[in-house]
Amino acid sequence: MKLSYPIFATVFGAVLFLAGACSSSSETDFSVDYEKFTLDNGLEVIFHKDDSDPVTAVALTFHVGSARELPGRTGFAHLFEHLLFLESENLGRGGLDQMSARIGGSGANGSTSRDRTNYFQTVPNDALEKMIWAEADKMGYFINTVNEMVLEKEKQVVKNEKRQGV
């Protein structure tokens, strides 16, 4: 069936009118109670407590990503994302994953974009303090565990992910 322009325009206009008429004109206020504070080292912490669930999402977002990298010198944010999952001085190789499994955590992962790098996982509520300690350990005590062999291996992993579009 071929529609003429006037009929199409009329039908299209009616659909737009009805869509606007059906939309709610009153907005529902949505708010989430949270605490926000800044640590002595400049780290901003946003804390929200939800007692309706037995698990807690632990998510860290760092304002660093590929947009801050120079042409010809890219991939560093993603490389650091990988390195931070490997080892720390206090937890050892694979220690973060082992600790997470021991306390019932799941979904540990990370992601890097143009303007941020995220690390996240879910843990039982009673394990939150342990996981925050483990995340702090990961951020503060991984660098001395990185040697040339580890660095080269992770560079290849990141390059491979880039080739695959991951």
Stretch-by-stretch model annotation:
Residues 1-11:
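Bacterial N-terminal signal peptides that target proteins for export
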Residues 2, 15-17, 38:
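Acidic/proline-rich low-complexity IDRs
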Residues 9-19:
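Bacterial N-terminal signal peptides
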Residues 22-98, 120-123, 129-136:
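His/Glu-rich zincin catalytic helix
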Residues 29, 62, 88-89, 95-166:
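Acidic/histidine-enriched segments that form metal/cofactor-coordinating
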